[in-house]
A protein has these predicted regions:
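Glycan-recognition and catalytic cores of secretory/periplasmic carbohydrate-active enzymes
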Residues: 1-189
Length: 189
């Protein structure tokens, strides 16, 4: 709703990135939404989702990495444990572009290209465990979010995800007119 009020594309990007994560990482083959993903991978908190500056430089090259890391607040000290960084946007794209003396369009190209490269690299890592329990209430919230995103963005895949998840919950999580709260391993309770 922040995007609808402000028309600031930053908020639209946050919605799109969040829903892309949910669709990619947190959606069951049947269409329901899983409940959680662990923070630990390989016994280390945040390892799957965090980056050392050197990793980014190796993947993107020095010039693109410098722009990418400035946009996402990556520093040698890191903002997480052991010098690792969680990517997060510190300032508006246009403001960062102005400081770096590049056009907003150029910076956006570097950011989008870098996101794809880092996502591909991250998918080569050992992923954290996922709690594959499907909770009815949380699915209701996600169905609502997907439907709302479709209304605002007009992207058909959000509507499709909402419909598939709603169908899944109605077919698998309602028995004798009663809502069942959890679904796991083919069983609803």
């Amino acid at each position: 709703e922040a995007y609808q009020v402000t028309q600031d594309n930053f908020y639209l990007q946050v919605v799109e990135d969040t829903l892309a994560y949910v669709l990619r990482e947190m959606t069951s083959p049947e269409g329901g939404f899983y409940s959680a993903q662990d923070a630990d991978s390989e016994g280390e908190e945040g390892k799957y989702f965090t980056w050392f500056p050197e990793e980014i430089e190796e993947l993107l090259g020095e010039q693109d990495a410098a722009l990418f890391m400035r946009y996402y607040g990556v520093s040698p000290e890191g903002n997480f444990e052991h010098g690792r960084s969680i990517l997060h946007v510190e300032n508006e794209l246009a403001d960062i572009a102005r400081v770096l003396q590049v056009s907003a369009g150029q910076l956006l190209e570097v950011i989008e290209r870098g996101q794809k490269v880092l996502l591909a690299a991250r998918q080569q890592r050992i992923a954290p465990e996922r709690d594959d329990k499907i909770l009815l209430a949380w699915n209701g919230l996600m169905i609502s979010a997907m439907a709302r995103a479709y209304q605002v963005c007009g992207e058909e895949h959000y509507l499709k995800a909402a419909v598939v998840a709603a169908d899944f919950t109605l077919e698998n999580m309602v028995r004798d007119g009663q809502l069942l709260h959890t679904y796991k391993d083919g069983q609803a309770r």
